[in-house]
Regions:
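A short, Lys/Arg-enriched amphipathic alpha-helix followed by its capping loop at the start of a domain
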Residues: 38-45, 64-65
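Gly/serine-rich nucleotide phosphate-binding loop at the start of the catalytic core
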Residues: 25-33, 38
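Boundary at the C-terminal end of the N-terminal hydrophobic targeting segment
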Residues: 17-19
Length: 300
């Protein structure tokens, strides 16, 4: 179709022009299965890797296709992710950071094995927990300092986070952290090239766009899953992405987060199958991430 081809070549051109400043690319995963899959997918055979330990985190550097890759394992959950990302920015000055790992699916159309690359990321646990109003059934006692802005989940009222950016000294309110548009365009171009499978052997989807949600909680609860999708329009949930997105936003470093679905975050029947699907989900995310990195590396 001519229009589709025109869109494809327009995106390819934009990515090629913009990607060239990405001389140093940070690549991060949270834990061992994700990290092994990422290195297996991204590193060329026989790559000459130089390891540097900083405050307990090991950073692996390699020169590949004229780019410097800096790879590290953040550790699981929000604070670990934020701390290690700031370490990487302070010591290695990456021009862009990509995360590869697993997540739980909130969107009912998703299945384990699918890969999702959200365009925006929100906090799950940035909220006020309020008392019930004893005089009004179904209501809560709202403090004078707090103004509800978003639908609540029982007594939990989500709120924005206040952030200071590099080059500024005034905190401002942020609801969602957007991914870098040029990295996001690179994902649009390269993702369809990847052939990945679900646990049952059927073709897995690579979904671009929507909202991702992060919090310091392993989500395996159907009621919150339904609420997050219906009210916040969040499509996946995990434990690091928004923290990394916020650190990137504060430092003005482009970010992209790629997630393979290991489970349905409580939407399944019976016991959660995250452990059974981890290897496949991590590998699928890493394969998509590797294609995006290759697109950046090959740009002139």
């Amino acid at each position: 179709m001519p229009f589709a081809l025109l869109c494809f070549f327009s995106l390819f051109s934009a990515v090629s022009v913009y990607a060239s400043p990405f001389k140093t690319i940070g690549l991060v995963s949270a834990w061992d299965p994700e990290m092994k899959a990422l290195k297996r997918a991204v590193l060329a055979p026989g790559a000459n890797v130089r390891n540097t330990e900083i405050d307990g985190t090991v950073f692996s550097e390699v020169q590949q296709r004229g780019r410097r890759l800096v790879i590290w394992m953040s550790g699981v959950s929000m604070i670990n992710a934020a701390m290690s990302t700031q370490l990487a920015i302070d010591h290695f000055h990456p021009d862009a950071i990509l995360f590869s790992g697993i997540a739980g699916g909130l969107d009912p159309s998703f299945q384990p094995g699918d890969v999702v690359i959200p365009e925006r990321w929100i906090h799950q646990a940035e909220a006020a927990w309020l008392n019930r109003d004893p005089e009004r059934s179904g209501s809560y006692v709202i403090p004078e300092y707090f103004r509800p802005r978003y639908p609540n989940f029982g007594n939990i009222f989500p709120d924005d986070v206040w952030v200071v950016r590099k080059g500024d000294t005034t905190p401002h309110r942020v609801h969602a952290f957007a991914m870098d548009p040029n990295l996001f365009d690179a994902a649009r171009v390269t993702a369809p090239k990847v052939s990945i499978r679900r646990p049952d052997g059927s073709k897995a989807n690579v979904v671009i766009g929507g909202i991702g949600m992060s919090g310091p909680i392993f989500l395996d609860d159907r009621s919150f899953r339904d609420f997050a999708f219906q009210k916040w329009h969040a499509r996946i949930h995990e434990m690091e992405g928004t923290a990394i997105a916020q650190v990137g936003y504060s430092n003005r470093v482009p970010i992209l987060i790629v997630r393979g679905l290991s489970d349905l975050a409580g939407g399944q029947r019976g016991v959660n199958q995250e452990e059974r699907n981890t290897q496949l989900a991590a590998s699928n995310a890493a394969e998509v991430t590797a294609e995006i990195v290759e697109q950046i590396e090959s740009a002139q």
